[in-house]
């Protein structure tokens, strides 16, 4: 089996209601999809991570101009070899961000192809499943104004609880004082309901602010 072509599909859609997290406002939902084609008719699909701030065209360009030339004619089942080929070829300029996301998209597509070729689920190819069930968590708690949204976030926590979630990840990073107020409101709303809370500031704080927030929580 040989890779004959790699196609990139960029998806973008404006949001009716933009929202914010600590690094900025998200006004679009976007994705960079990659389709790896082979000479025996199989195709594998992968997706590059996009949080909503980076243009999906960056990962698309990395796949088209940096990664695709390294892969054409290769056996897609040689996943580890191809991963190192892509990583080492781009390590001087692509060890994080959209270039690594592009590499990840191709890697996912290669695993998808390999699973199809073997007619087996990927977890079997990776050595088996440790469990058949996982506990999901609700993420969200994004902002629509920025600060001073504690009451709305507490209501959101109650909705997640009513939907059956017992783990929740709260987006913070809007100022330590505001974060503390929001977490206090959320805690009061779900206290005694068997909910575990997690937080994610998306690298908003330095050491001093992170310690202050952690100690307060």
Language-model segment annotations:
Residues 37-117:
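Metal- or metallocofactor-binding catalytic centers and their adjacent structured scaffolds
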Residues 127-217:
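Metal-dependent enolase-superfamily TIM-barrel catalytic cores that perform enediolate-based chemistry
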Residues 1-52:
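Structured beta-strand/loop patches that form or line metal/cofactor-binding pockets in enzymes
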Residues 28-31, 58, 62, 77, ...:
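Conserved active-site and cofactor/substrate-binding residues in soluble primary-metabolism enzymes
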Residues 1, 104, 163:
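Structured loop/turn residues at beta-strand edges in well-structured enzyme cores
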Residues 66, 85, 105-108, 112-113, ...:
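Alpha-helical scaffold segments in soluble metabolic enzymes
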Residues 1-5, 9-10, 116, 120-132:
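N-terminal amphipathic alpha-helix/helix-capping segment at the start of soluble metabolic enzymes
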């Amino acid at each position: 089996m040989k890779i004959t072509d790699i196609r990139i599909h960029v998806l973008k859609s404006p949001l009716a209601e933009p929202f914010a997290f600590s690094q900025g406002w998200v006004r679009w939902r976007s994705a960079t999809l990659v389709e790896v084609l082979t000479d025996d008719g199989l195709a594998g699909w992968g997706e590059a991570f996009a949080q909503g701030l980076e243009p999906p065209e960056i990962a698309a360009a990395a796949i088209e101009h940096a990664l695709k030339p390294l892969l054409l004619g290769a056996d897609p089942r040689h996943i580890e070899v191809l991963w190192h080929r892509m990583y080492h070829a781009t390590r001087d300029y692509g060890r994080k961000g959209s270039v690594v996301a592009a590499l990840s998209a191709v890697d996912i597509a290669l695993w998808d192809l390999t699973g199809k070729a073997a007619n087996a689920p990927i977890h079997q190819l990776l050595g088996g499943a440790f469990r058949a069930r996982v506990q999901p968590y609700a993420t969200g708690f994004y902002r629509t104004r920025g600060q001073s949204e504690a009451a709305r976030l507490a209501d959101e926590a109650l909705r997640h609880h009513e939907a059956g979630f017992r783990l929740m990840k709260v987006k913070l990073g809007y100022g330590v004082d505001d974060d503390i107020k929001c977490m206090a409101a959320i805690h009061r709303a779900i206290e005694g309901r068997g909910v575990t809370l997690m937080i994610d500031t998306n690298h908003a704080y330095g050491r001093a602010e992170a310690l202050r927030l952690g100690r307060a929580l």
